[in-house]
């Protein structure tokens, strides 16, 4: 990125133990004009600090909670304020973060699913319609080079006429009980309350 011509964004979650956080940071880098300037990256200030040190982020823009981060951004004006916050956390956190972001007037880029249940989804839709704060869900799959190649092959007719297709997302790594072996990525996925 040349000079300081970039759009400032914040990140909530996505710290050291986050699988999707790395994917989001890589995608942000590829865009070229976005820069993470602060956020709340872990369950403690120390975990967040350990994470941001190698990234060269300003410790003043590190917050112990997403609420503190979003409320601080609400008070900032113009170029000091982030353009949006990217939230990469377990599913049960999507709703409270989105609601807080909208209360603070901060656009949010979230992950799937929007919420954990239909009531939360309805509340979220009402909140967004009332506040008009943009809320978007990340769809990173179109950025994969494999999909671009598949699209090219289809367009060129290289594989003939498509009559039917089936797509699935496998999580083979969860076929074994990896949550019993300390895998934090698996813990929240197998807990019905989370």
Please place each PLM-identified region on the residue numbering.
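N-terminal Rossmann-like dinucleotide-binding module
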Residues: 1-57, 185
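Beta-loop-alpha module in the N-terminal Rossmann-like domain of NAD(P)-dependent dehydrogenases
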Residues: 61-127
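Rossmann-like NAD(P)(H) cofactor-binding subdomain of soluble oxidoreductases
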Residues: 93, 113, 117, 136-143, ...
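Rossmann-fold dehydrogenase core element
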Residues: 123-141, 163-164
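Predominantly a Rossmann-like dinucleotide-binding segment in NAD(P)-dependent oxidoreductases
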Residues: 141-194
């Amino acid at each position: 990125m040349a000079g300081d011509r970039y759009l400032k964004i914040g990140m909530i979650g996505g710290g050291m133990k986050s699988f999707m956080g790395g994917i989001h940071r890589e995608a942000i880098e590829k865009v070229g004009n976005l820069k993470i300037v602060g956020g709340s990256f872990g369950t403690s200030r120390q975990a967040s600090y350990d994470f941001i040190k190698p990234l060269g982020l300003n410790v003043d823009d590190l917050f112990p909670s997403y609420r503190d981060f979003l409320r601080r951004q609400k008070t900032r004006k113009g170029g000091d304020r982030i353009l949006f916050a990217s939230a990469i956390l377990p599913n049960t956190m999507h709703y409270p973060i989105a609601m807080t972001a909208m209360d603070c007037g901060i656009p949010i880029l979230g992950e799937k699913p929007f919420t954990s249940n239909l009531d939360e989804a309805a509340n979220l839709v009402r909140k967004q319609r009332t506040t008009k704060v943009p809320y978007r869900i990340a769809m990173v799959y179109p950025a994969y080079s494999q999909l671009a190649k598949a699209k090219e092959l289809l367009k060129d007719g290289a594989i003939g006429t498509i009559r039917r297709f089936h797509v699935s997302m496998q999580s083979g790594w969860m076929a074994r009980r990896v949550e019993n072996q300390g895998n934090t990525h698996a813990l929240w996925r197998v807990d019905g309350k989370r």
